[in-house]
Amino acid sequence: NPFTQYRYNLERYVKETREAGATPILMSSIVRRKFNEHGTLEDTHGNYPLVVRMVARDLEVPFIDMQYLTERLERKFGPEKSESIHLHFEPGENPYYQNGKHDDTHLSYTGAKMIASLALQEIARQDLALENYIKHQVLEAEIVTLKD
């Protein structure tokens, strides 16, 4: 249940992180690639992302809305092109998946780079202290942009 044990665990992680002298940052989950027959991206996470938002607000923790950012990315790519973000391989196309793979949850190497880029861009946009540890050439590379 996102409103009980999940929320409790998030609050505990924030408390323990602060007690250790670190600064917590909460992120919502990335979306799954699930388009319906009309080409509309469907939510698959229920209330879990909402609870992360609530904990971030209530405990005044920096929050990165990866659900929103990745939803925009999936929509920008659309039902077909978004396969490249995930593990979609035909038999023999990838040595790790000789029999092929059609996985709309896990990311391809390309997708992982895109999602990491979005997270890093948001860290910089929010001017979080963590930005000091990001190489500027990584931010300047702008692997993916959500600008229209």
Residue ranges with predicted function:
Residues 1-113, 117-135, 143-148:
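Alpha-helical cap/lid subdomain in secreted, periplasmic
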Residues 138:
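Acidic helix/loop microenvironments that form the catalytic cleft of cell-wall polysaccharide enzymes
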